[in-house]
Amino acid sequence: MDPRTLMTRPTVAVLYKYVPQYRRRFFELLSDRLTERDVELILVYGDPGPEDVGKGDAVELPWATKVPNVTITVAGRTLYWQRALKVLHGADLVIVEQASKLLINYALLALQTAGRTRLALWGHGVNLKQEEASRLGEALKRAVSRRAAWWFAYTDATAALVRGFGYPAERITVVQNAIDTRELTVERERLTTTETGREEVAALRRRLGLFGHNVGLFVGAMYEQKRLPFLLEACVRIRELVPDFEMVFVGGGPDKPLVERAAAAHPWIHAVGPVFDEARVPYFLLADLVLMPGLVGLGILDCFALEVPMVTTAVHYHSPEIAYLDDGVNGMMLSAACSPAQFAEAAAALLHDAERADRLRAGCRQARSRYTVEEMVERFADGVTKALDVQGLAQ
């Protein structure tokens, strides 16, 4: 008898600090896909820490296992110990977030050295916010990265960084990080094709007091790396170049007072506050462009889903998903050195060029079909299968 017929199906554990809303659908689909491949998924997670709790985006997954997260502050930095070793015992592959502050990663690496499990990393490769990065933390991250049994890289750019550590390319899976935007596209369809939907959008326009037909939109958290002072200065210049230009800000955060003061001074600037999920869709339908001169992350996928091109700059601290923006095809990427006036001139030129704007919207539609959570799940499941194959465990 083949000894493998006596084996139980292989088990893969994913250890996550906490589960944000945008990851729920991914984990649900991944569990289903791995079950189809005769692989058991164990998801282990905790509560958000002090730097995340204010986001209000944590969700509970009844089918997963929740463990306590213990936080320790050392030299002003928050470190985490996740009480998960007992739950992870016996897993053939443990996938963790690549973060030097997650202390359990070092314990799991020791268990891998002892032949007790295999450790895979999932992440960015480096801390893209270099001004916040710890030199020791980044050195530890590189050392651990080279010793992982497998790597799940967010994007092609992440994979290139990991290869730069000396990690073998054949053990890297590019997962093409994405979120589920189906609800956004369904809501867009409803709002644009039904009489009641169109009236809802018109009512929002009246409620905001939008009189112009050239509208910019900012959606997201408001903090330093979003460059709101830069954007507000640029908006004033756009208004000079495009007299009916209006700007809508959706979101909250420590820099929200900057936007509120600008809105008080300029009636064509509208400060809305936080709006989530499909409730954001009508704001996109009122907009011609998303203006985001600072950090861009998964929000680029909202622009693709809702067919509103983004204008941004090539700052060095973008999240990996900025790789999905193809300058001149599905959005616009300006120099990191551009001034607010130059940013404004580029945005105004696009508002005046309907043909070019239509091409960018078509590019958004194409990108929408490429960067999907379903594709991410398939790539991730392929990586899991390959990692288990290395151990001779995939069935």
Model regions: which residues?
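A short, well-ordered alpha-helix in the C-terminal region of glycosyltransferases
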Residues: R239, Q342, A349, R356-R370
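A short, histidine- and acid-enriched strand-loop-helix "catalytic/donor-clamping" loop
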Residues: L103, T117-R135, R147-W150
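Conserved donor-binding/catalytic core segment of Leloir-type glycosyltransferases
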Residues: A13, T192, R198-E199, A203-K226, ...
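A conserved mid-protein helix/loop that constitutes part of the nucleotide-sugar donor-binding site
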Residues: R24-E28, N214-R237, M247, P254-P257, ...
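Donor nucleotide-sugar binding/catalytic pocket of nucleotide-sugar-dependent glycosyltransferases
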Residues: R142-A203, L210-F211
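Nucleotide-activated donor-binding/catalytic signature segment of Leloir-type glycosyltransferases, i.e.
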Residues: R9, N69, P257-E278
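Acidic donor-binding loop of glycosyltransferase active sites
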Residues: L285-L298, V308-P309
